[in-house]
């Protein structure tokens, strides 16, 4: 269903993968974040979210190993990238963000707001994906 490289995904890491149908056709690509021992976050393309969610709901019933929760409306995601992105975020975050390797993530605060920061952008520029409560998005 979700094809990822064989390596185990460690807590605090993300991996890029593809969501496939039984014939191997690609439904979407997505990032998978491992947030805890049994806690993962899947971020598909926003324009394809409903298709991906329907796909997972179709295949997950009867499998006690997984619980799917659509949290899309509860969170905002901002790709903060460019030559000054890291320096700007470091002024607002209580940590040295340069220590985060590509595809690393950390739950921390930015300007006092609980966020998930992830070095997972793939626009060609360095930076962070910032995931935070939707109600806090405009203020940040």
Say what each PLM segment does:
Residues 1-140:
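Basic, glycine/lysine-rich polyanion-binding surfaces/domains
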């Amino acid at each position: 269903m979700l094809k990822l490289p064989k390596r185990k995904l460690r807590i605090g890491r993300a991996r890029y993968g593809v969501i496939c149908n039984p014939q191997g056709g690609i439904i979407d690509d997505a990032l998978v974040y491992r947030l805890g021992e049994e806690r993962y976050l899947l971020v598909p393309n926003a324009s394809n979210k409903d298709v991906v969610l329907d796909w997972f709901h179709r295949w997950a019933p009867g499998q006690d190993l997984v619980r799917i929760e659509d949290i899309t409306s509860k969170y905002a995601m901002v790709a903060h990238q460019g030559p000054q992105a890291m320096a700007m975020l470091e002024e607002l975050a209580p940590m040295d963000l340069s220590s985060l390797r590509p595809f690393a993530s950390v739950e921390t605060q930015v300007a006092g707001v609980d966020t998930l920061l992830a070095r997972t952008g793939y626009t060609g520029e360095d930076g962070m994906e910032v995931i935070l409560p939707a109600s806090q998005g405009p203020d940040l």
